[in-house]
């Protein structure tokens, strides 16, 4: 579960390395974000020459969480890190590559580009 002040790694090549969650989108009382949810983040560290610069406020979709995610078939999935992919306002990716595995739940949330570029879908 991702909430305000959570730090996430960036799983794409947009130039950012670390994000800080500012807001979970989807309602005024929404506290937690899980896999497939869109959050508003601040870029805390970035590589020089990248598309995204340090201090920028961006939207991102959560692709991996440390907390367990329950699926409809009763199985659970969790990862070793919290990670997100930076997106534009129209749900298009800023980067052109995805690093690390992503979950099948992104397919249900219409993030097909992320699923197709990921090296592994769990």
From Swiss-Prot:
Signal peptide (residue range): none
GO molecular function, one term: large ribosomal subunit rRNA binding
SUPFAM superfamilies per record: Ribosomal protein L14
UniProt keyword annotation of rRNA-binding present: yes
One example of a Gene Ontology biological process annotation: translation
InterPro entries: Ribosomal_uL14, Ribosomal_uL14_bac-type, Ribosomal_uL14_CS, Ribosomal_uL14_sf
Name of this chain's protein: Large ribosomal subunit protein uL14
Organism of origin: Alkaliphilus metalliredigens (strain QYMF)
